[in-house]
């Protein structure tokens, strides 16, 4: 069975791992980084994903998309989307009630759903794994915040399908991190472990009991909209005000300036985890004005005081739900890059009366590590280190339906172990009622209007009868991905209807997913074509400059002057052509190279046969991938 991979699809960074040779390997990307920015950029000539996209963001802010995880499975009118839009340089809009991200790609306006952007990041992670493993990969386990609701999980699964992945399972990030911790620690007797997972955009707290390879989640709580990005936002707002006060200039409307400031703030935040203060130095931030300033750790903590303190609320809630006292927690495990912030650690440690926090696992890689283990288990890995592991996860929110008077009647209570199936019998509210409308909600409030509507369906054809007579049996069934199926059957007639919750019209239809898969293949082919084009251009450039240097340098005395001038003149023509044709097609570069070789090769061969060739020249003429021998030297602009 080919290895399945585990992908941590993060708000700001993603990470991929694979279980092989009895252990998990976290895979580095082509830049040598073990985490990859969850960024996708669109330019006049190409699409960039990962480091390449993040590195050019200041030059191309409106067409560089990030934070797709803060959009996925949400509606346009969601308050969190509306507040985030103030901070994003790219445009978010709605088309036919569906949320879309607008960019300009190759000179044309394009619209993408959050699932499509996430699928591009997943494709990148898939390619990272494939180039490491040396073969195609199709099976994957993808992680989501434990507090993600049904629509967000379903949308993440769809993103996997668009990326050409067979999603074996969607698992919760803190649970994945607990696997990494449990395997690493070889936990023996029963231990209560609290996972505190504060990442770039989401926050989860889960309490698990780990004993002899059984990971049982007791409770989970969190905020799907709190993380490092929010701390950056506070700093950005602070400096925008400072800049306005100092120079009387508002940089809010200048997207490039705002992006450069955000990048500097992100860097400053990281520095403040190890230093008491740091400088921000941004040359020519706005209208030629330089911005040099200082921020102390104390000021950073003050700007985020409410957010930092707020991380303790889900900790208290998780303890209450697990019916545990804080003294019963054996280990507090930190996961996610934002747990490096000293103030966050101090608040948590103080809450647990000075108990030591566990920092033994890598906060950036633990989730992908656990996902890779779960992927190995699901694809039948027989290694004894993992085969006896059992994961018992829970539903993060209560699920139920609306009954008379808009009351929420929960069939599955939050923190119920999944997979689970619950059935309850309902009846009609009025005499001779011909049908019932089954409206499915998730949430903890008593009235459905305060909860989230997941979907609805009609069970019709109920024979006329007095109210309270018909018996309608409703079944809620949550699968191991945390995704819900609801069915209803009229016991009298045997009529039934069912629904896989498809998130009030926000969910992609089967046809849309198929179209997006086709689009993804098309973009991938375009990316490859662009890579081939650049490679052909580099090969021609490398050949022409090598040739020119050789005949003007070490071969100068060995070639007849007339031949030398022929080569120089042809090289200069080619260089002039290259200056004008920066975006020619692959075949044009190749035919130019052939033309050049036709002129140069016979002259060089004559010198070579006469024994005048310096060592290695013959090889060098093929630098840039032309000769097929030795490594390709790629020039970097």
UniProtKB/Swiss-Prot annotation:
Entries under Gene3D superfamilies matching the protein: 1.20.1270.10, 3.30.30.30, 3.30.420.40, Actin, Chain A, domain 4, Substrate Binding Domain Of DNAk, Chain A, domain 1
Keyword terms, alphabetized: ATP-binding, Nucleotide-binding, Stress response
Keyword hit for ATP-binding: yes
Start and end residues of each stretch annotated as Disordered: 615-637
One Pfam family linked to the record: HSP70
Keyword ATP-binding: yes
Alphabetical list of CDD domains matching this protein: ASKHA_NBD_HSP70_HSPA1
Gene Ontology MF term list: ATP binding; ATP-dependent protein folding chaperone
Similarity field: Belongs to the heat shock protein 70 family.
Known function: Major immunogen in Schistosoma mansoni infections. Possibly plays an important role in parasite development and pathogenesis.
Name of the protein described by the UniProt record: Heat shock 70 kDa protein homolog
Organism, scientific name: Schistosoma mansoni (Blood fluke)
